[in-house]
């Protein structure tokens, strides 16, 4: 599969209803509700303080300031992504100076519990973004078969924006398909700026890196 992501902050929480009505007008098949969850983990300040200073009396504020710019094993942040349509699978994405080539892997969604329970002395959950929306499918000679997902994005219950995801079957997206997608986006009045096409990895890993690029630090 190939995915394209788009995030817009210049909307309200009710904008999604307008776009869903437009999808219905385009005769898209409603596949039901869709949701996702993106979590960001950062190095535990206490762990960095112990490993670098061998001193348990470092003030908490200094530890947190150090953690903001520090890495553990060359990794500065871990992200986990779960999506409603890929139940049981979680994408694990890393960022940092040591991350080269494949930036992540697909793991069981139980890995999130391992991070929070077994590895909390090393990694701390810093941010959770949740998306709630719907999934549609477009079919036609112009588009091929493409799924359109859209969701309101929330950070700790506060609305932050609207995310679109376009998913194509196959391993590549040719120029013709990309052109038809842009025509569909423009004719539907959907946001067309800041489209994230491609990315590191492939399949779900590529999707995970797109989510991180679009939503990290939002």
Swiss-Prot record:
It comes from the Eukaryota. Its main location: nucleus. GO terms for cellular component: mediator complex. Keywords: Activator, Nucleus, Transcription, Transcription regulation. It is found in: Nucleus. GO terms for molecular function: transcription coactivator activity. One of its GO terms (biological process) is regulation of transcription by RNA polymerase II. The keyword Oxidoreductase does not apply. The keyword Transcription applies. Component of the Mediator complex. Belongs to the Mediator complex subunit 20 family. This is Mediator of RNA polymerase II transcription subunit 20. The gene is SRB2.
